[in-house]
């Protein structure tokens, strides 16, 4: 049943694997033909987008697990546990506002993904929801690409990669090549050995370019939001 798939998948991730589901707001700026902002809306998660997202995550995880089980090096997407100092800072802020206390606070500072998810669920639907999500999200490490599998903390996944996504990354292509070679019985081909020799550098480059492109996207959006605000202010 496709309609219940996202709910069943999400329930399995939270209850059995301890995944974390951050609920943040993402703005989308609509531009006219001249590149001027004409509208700003908040992207909302719908049943359709949840279905696509969960299917994509499952495909990525299945491919990563297959390659990892076969001992294949590729561009794995790795997310490490949060740094203790970052969690302590987040806990201090949430405690001062009376949002976390007792044993839950102790579990959160150890990096328990279940505790983080519980704090997020407690804040859901309250005025503090967006703030709590932001504080805990900023305490997380940034996910990176590595040539070896080391799991994905936030997803609770033993292995993860970018195999399919709305945008085609170079990391996706590295995974496609590795998967095709494995399925064709050519995992030890000359081409794959050549890729393997430079894989660590390729992963570092993919991680760095992602940081740069994400920063450029945020800066561009801020500029357009400021332009839109300026236009509205001049009209008033």
Predicted regions and their residues:
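Electropositive polyanion-binding surfaces
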Residues: 4-236
